[in-house]
Amino acid sequence: MWGARRRSSGGSVYTNEYMSISPGKLKHLKALSNAKGIISAAAMDQRGSLQKSIATAKGVDVKAVTPEMMSEFKTAVTRVLTPHASAILLDPEFGLDAAKARSSNAGLLLAYEETGYDNTQPGRLPDLLPHVSAKRIKDWGADAVKILIYYTPFDTADINDVKHAFIERVGAECEFNEIPFFLEFVGYDPKGGDEKGLEFAKIKPQVVIGSMEEFTKPQYRVDVLKVEVPVNAEFVEGSAVYKGQKAYTRAEALGHYRRAAEVATKPFIYLSAGVSNAQFVESLHMATEAGTDYSGVLCGRATWKDGMGIYGKQGVKALEDWLSDQGVKNIEAVNAALGGATPWAKKLGIGAAA
């Protein structure tokens, strides 16, 4: 086992924060990283939202978007963008053929959760794909299991306890199969407010920090936290994408980045959460300015979302042409912003990942 013991200020060694990782998990984490030990991964596991966007572009009912169309879109994104990424996140429902099209340099993560959430009851409760397991994900050649849950510390204790138990089960399953567990949590307003608006932006730091503080705990056995940036850059006064309404000054925003990083005892990477490429790049610049020890990104729609309309209206060849031009420019802009990222091995205290 690889591990690290943290020293107290007095110099004595204590083990209550002992972190370890199996050789099997370590091998897979290396496969997901670039030469510097940074995770610069692309995300293409969208399902429900992708179907809706393609349907809108085609002017058809969502049921007219076939599994073949979904696979075709995912395969094009994978083939064109993975030469510029350390890994790709796909889903077992429509993405297994796409996984075969990835560049030889790129590792593979597979989603384990059902798309969306249970909307028949409060709390945005998650569920697993019924024909998938951590073992099957590993057998399909993946280097990591990814789970997305919707989470906020401000929901009821009962709802959050269901989610805690859910993640404990997945963590144990991944641990047994020696495959890394990437946990993505996306915040929401239990009262139904607009998560892209000013009022949610004001509480977003507490949502992100509280979520990171919870799921960094050892009982969840998460290896990498896939997190939202703790602020909405459109409401950061003076940011490159500032829209005029202030939720925080730049100094306050940088403080939120630092506090979020401080609570994480596990490596964490940022997700793009559907924002524009410019907004995500600005968010990464703020992370670097704040001095946070994030270990990379898993970037999806900020790279390829404009391609959905092109595919829907003009087909796969037009999509591939767009990806080869603007899509590559988008992913390279993200890669260029990763200069301040910290290798995950350093966060784990195990030295170089090589």
Protein language model annotation of sequence segments:
Residues 17-157, 221, 245-249, 266-267, ...:
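Alpha/beta catalytic barrel-like cores
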Residues 73-79, 127-144, 152, 159-160, ...:
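Alpha/beta enzyme core
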